[in-house]
Amino acid sequence: MADLEEQLSDEEKVRIAAKFIIHAPPGEFNEVFNDVRLLLNNDNLLREGAAHAFAQYNLDQFTPVKIDGYEDQVLITEHGDLGNGKFLDPKNRICFKFDHLRKEATDPRPYEAENAAESWRTSVETALRAYVKEHYPNGVCTVYGKKIDGQQTIIACIESHQFQAKNFWNGRWRSEWKFTITPSTTQVVGILKIQVHYYEDGNVQLVSHKDIQDSLTVSNEVQTAKEFIKIVEAAENEYQTAISENYQTMSDTTFKALRRQLPVTRTKIDWNKILSYKIGKEMQNA
C-alpha cells in the first residue's frame, strides 16, 4: 500500500477521491467525504482539488436547500447555476450563494432576470407544486423559464428523498422535464431517475433511469400547464409501477432460483435430532 501511495501523484489521488464523492449514494455524501478525507490525509488538497466534485454531486442530485426568510426549498441544478457559486430561486426571484460542501444557502438578494415566459413558468410551477404535494410527501420542485436556442423553454425539476440511515437504506427520486413554448403543439422531453442504497449485512444499489418523450398541446398558460401535468403524472406512475412489478418478478423467479430449497444432502435437518448427526457430535467435542 505504501508503494502504491508513493507512485500516485497528488493529481491522481484527487481524481480518485473526486470519483468516490461524485458517486456517493444519496444521503451519504458526508460519510463518503469523511472516508475519502482519511484516505487522502490532506484537507487542503481535498478541498481545492475536489471542489468541482462537491458541486457536481449537488447539481446531479438536485440537492434541495432552505433559504433563510423563505418558506419553500429550492433545488440546486445546472439550470439555476448563475456562476461563481450563485444560484437562482425563480419562484422568489432571488439569487443566493451556495456552499457545496456545507450545503448551505447564504446572502439572498433580489434577482430580476429577463424572462418573457414568466407567466408560463408561473402557471407550470403552480400546477407542478400541487402535483408534487399530492404524490411526493417530501418532494421539492423548481421550475425555470429560459431562452434556449432562441426559444422560450420551460424546465421543471422534481426531487424527493427518504434517508433512513438507522434502517440502513437511503433513496432519492429525480425527474426533469422540458418543453418549448411553440404554437399549437410541442414536444415534452423528460428523464426519470431512481437511486436506492441498501446496506444492512450487504451492499445493494438500485440505479435506474428512463427517458420520456410525448407531445403537448399548447393553448393558454393555465390549460397547457394542466395538460403538461397529465403527461408527467402518467409517465411517473407508469415508471414507478414498472419498477415495483420488476422487483416482484425478480423475487418470484430470479432470486428464488438462486436459493437452495434443500441442503446439499437433499434432506432437511431435524434440529431435534441434531446430536445424532455427525455435525452435532463434532460441535459437542469442540
UniProtKB/Swiss-Prot annotation:
Q: Which Gene3D superfamilies match?
A: F-actin capping protein, alpha subunit, F-actin capping protein, beta subunit
Q: Which PROSITE patterns match?
A: F_ACTIN_CAPPING_A_1, F_ACTIN_CAPPING_A_2
Where Phosphoserine occurs, the residues are 9
Pfam families tied to this protein: F-actin_cap_A
Q: What GO CC annotations are associated with the protein?
A: cortical cytoskeleton; F-actin capping protein complex
Write down the InterPro entries for this protein, in alphabetical order: CapZ_alpha, CapZ_alpha/beta, CapZ_alpha/beta_2, CapZ_alpha_1, F-actin_cap_asu_CS
Positions bearing N-acetylalanine? 2
**Would you kindly state one Gene Ontology biological process term found in this protein's UniProt entry?**
barbed-end actin filament capping
GO MF annotation: an example: actin filament binding
Top-rank taxon: Eukaryota
- The entry's keywords: Acetylation, Actin capping, Actin-binding, Phosphoprotein
On assembly, the entry states: Component of the F-actin capping complex, composed of a heterodimer of an alpha and a beta subunit. Component of the WASH complex, composed of F-actin-capping protein subunit alpha (CAPZA1, CAPZA2 or CAPZA3), F-actin-capping protein subunit beta (CAPZB), WASHC1, WASHC2, WASHC3, WASHC4 and WASHC5. Interacts with RCSD1/CAPZIP. Directly interacts with CRACD; this interaction decreases binding to actin.
| Free-text function comment from the UniProt entry | F-actin-capping proteins bind in a Ca(2+)-independent manner to the fast growing ends of actin filaments (barbed end) thereby blocking the exchange of subunits at these ends. Unlike other capping proteins (such as gelsolin and severin), these proteins do not sever actin filaments.
Protein family membership: Belongs to the F-actin-capping protein alpha subunit family.
Name of the protein in its database record:
F-actin-capping protein subunit alpha-2
Q: What is the lineage of its organism?
A: Eukaryota, Metazoa, Chordata, Craniata, Vertebrata
